[in-house]
């Protein structure tokens, strides 16, 4: 997708940069970071991340720095207006989701309710 089109989900430079490095380590340029939502966690829904070399029908792919972020349509409805980022800090390094649709989140930030 073009950078000048309003996207429903932001893929930050930090996240794209980390994905680029991780894909280079795997030596598979077809890999993309997939973000998804599943039921569970202490708040009802939880975020998941995996590397995937398949893009399914209906998936949205957001390209940045030559790498892709893939989201299935069911998960995207909960993520509209949000951002996938990468952070490094005292608690470790990880991909995170900033989600304006979440009414509450758990302390670790990996689960939420709407």
UniProtKB/Swiss-Prot annotation:
Database matches in SUPFAM superfamilies: HesB-like domain (SSF89360)
InterPro entries: FeS_biogenesis, FeS_cluster_insertion, FeS_cluster_insertion_CS, FeS_cluster_insertion_RrpA, HesB-like_dom_sf
Superkingdom of this protein's organism: Bacteria
An example Gene Ontology CC term for this record: cytosol
Keyword list, A-Z: Iron, Iron-sulfur, Metal-binding
UniProt cofactor note: Binds 1 iron-sulfur cluster per subunit.
Any one GO molecular function term: 2 iron, 2 sulfur cluster binding
Keyword Iron set for record: yes
Cofactor needs: iron-sulfur cluster
GO terms (BP aspect): iron-sulfur cluster assembly
Binding positions for iron-sulfur cluster per the UniProt entry: 42, 106, 108
Function (record text): Required for insertion of 4Fe-4S clusters for at least IspG.
Assembly description: Homodimer.
Family under the similarity heading: Belongs to the HesB/IscA family.
Cited NCBIfam families: iron-sulfur cluster assembly accessory protein, PRK13623.1
Protein name: Iron-sulfur cluster insertion protein ErpA
Organism: Klebsiella pneumoniae (strain 342)
Gene symbol of the encoding locus: erpA
């Amino acid at each position: 997708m073009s950078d000048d089109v309003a996207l429903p989900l932001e893929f930050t430079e930090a996240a794209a940069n980390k994905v680029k490095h991780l894909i280079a380590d795997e030596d598979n340029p077809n890999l993309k970071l997939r973000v998804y939502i599943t039921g569970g966690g202490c708040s009802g829904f939880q975020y998941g991340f995996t590397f995937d070399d398949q893009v399914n029908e209906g998936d949205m792919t957001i390209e940045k720095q030559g790498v892709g972020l893939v989201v299935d349509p069911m998960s995207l409805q909960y993520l509209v207006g949000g951002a996938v980022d990468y952070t490094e800090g005292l608690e470790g390094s990880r991909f995170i989701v900033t989600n304006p649709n979440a009414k509450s989140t758990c302390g670790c930030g990996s689960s939420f309710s709407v």
